[in-house]
């Protein structure tokens, strides 16, 4: 699995805004949207393209389009914040959904939604979730995708924790690459990333007050 940490001043500035506990929900959302576009741009670097002739107002030129646009799969809830940024970069991408909540006692993922194409064979998949902490949610989602034939999965996360990265590397699953803005060193006793940025879902949308 390739691990790609995007080193860029604009990436760092948006990540700083997201980390800052003073950032309000709207400021956090705006920074996440900007950072999401940057990470999707980087994740798309290896997508295959077809060439075709295009007529400019002056002459002919070579045109380029994606051979197979990826399917964007957010892990709900926080992953929803990355859908619009991804679609702004790849407007012809299809979107699937995986809903997972975190059991605050066990820190294990609790699935509650799955809306995916039946056959993902041969299709690039961008699995998006702002946070990679223990890796439990991401691994659960990857197994769902693999069960439908996905064999080219790119995980796009804003912040990854070293324990989650190691869990992803150790899993025998079809993960091609991880694209992230940073790898933080550890998790606390509540399995939150340290230093991290808190609960991305809460900072996007407010506290979740429904037990699943």
UniProtKB/Swiss-Prot annotation:
Which chain regions cross the lipid bilayer?
A: none
Q: How is the cofactor bound?
A: Binds 1 Mg(2+) ion per subunit. The magnesium is bound as Mg-PRPP.
Ways its activity is controlled = Allosterically activated by GTP.
What are its cofactors? Mg(2+)
Q: Which CDD domains match?
A: PRTases_typeI
Listed pathway(s)? Pyrimidine metabolism; UMP biosynthesis via salvage pathway; UMP from uracil: step 1/1
Q: What keywords is this UniProt entry annotated with?
A: Allosteric enzyme, Glycosyltransferase, GTP-binding, Magnesium, Nucleotide-binding, Transferase
Instruction: Provide the E.C. number(s) assigned to this enzyme.
Output: 2.4.2.9
Question: A single GO BP annotation from the record?
Answer: UMP salvage
Report the GO molecular function annotations. Answer: GTP binding; magnesium ion binding; uracil phosphoribosyltransferase activity
Q: Does the keyword Membrane apply?
A: no
Q: Which reaction does it catalyse?
A: UMP + diphosphate = 5-phospho-alpha-D-ribose 1-diphosphate + uracil
Provide the binding site for uracil. 193, 198-200
Q: Which residues bind 5-phospho-alpha-D-ribose 1-diphosphate?
A: 77, 102, 129-137, 199
- One Pfam short name: UPRTase
Protein family (similarity comment): Belongs to the UPRTase family.
- Which HAMAP family does this one have? Upp_B
Q: What does this protein do?
A: Catalyzes the conversion of uracil and 5-phospho-alpha-D-ribose 1-diphosphate (PRPP) to UMP and diphosphate.
Q: What is this protein called?
A: Uracil phosphoribosyltransferase
Ranked from the top, the taxonomy reads: Bacteria, Bacillati, Actinomycetota, Actinomycetes, Mycobacteriales
């Amino acid at each position: 699995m390739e691990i790609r940490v995007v080193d860029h001043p604009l990436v760092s500035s948006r990540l700083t805004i997201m980390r800052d506990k003073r950032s309000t929900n709207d400021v956090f959302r705006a920074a996440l949207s900007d950072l999401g576009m940057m990470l999707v741009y980087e994740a798309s670097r290896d997508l295959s393209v077809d060439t075709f002739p295009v007529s400019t107002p002056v002459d002919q030129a070579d045109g380029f389009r994606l051979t197979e646009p990826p399917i964007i799969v957010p892990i709900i809830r926080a992953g929803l914040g990355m859908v619009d940024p991804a679609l702004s970069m790849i407007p012809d991408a299809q979107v699937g959904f995986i809903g997972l909540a975190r059991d605050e006692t066990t820190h294990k993922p609790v699935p509650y939604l799955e809306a995916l194409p039946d056959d993902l064979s041969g299709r690039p998949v961008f699995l998006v979730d702002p946070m990679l902490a223990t890796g439990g949610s991401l691994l659960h989602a990857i197994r769902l995708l693999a069960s439908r034939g996905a064999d080219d999965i790119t995980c796009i996360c804003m912040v990854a924790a070293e324990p989650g990265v190691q869990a992803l590397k150790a899993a025998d699953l079809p993960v091609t690459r991880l694209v992230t803005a940073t790898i933080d060193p550890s998790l606390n006793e509540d399995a939150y990333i340290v230093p991290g940025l808190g609960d991305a879902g809460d900072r996007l949308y407010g506290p979740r007050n429904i037990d699943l």
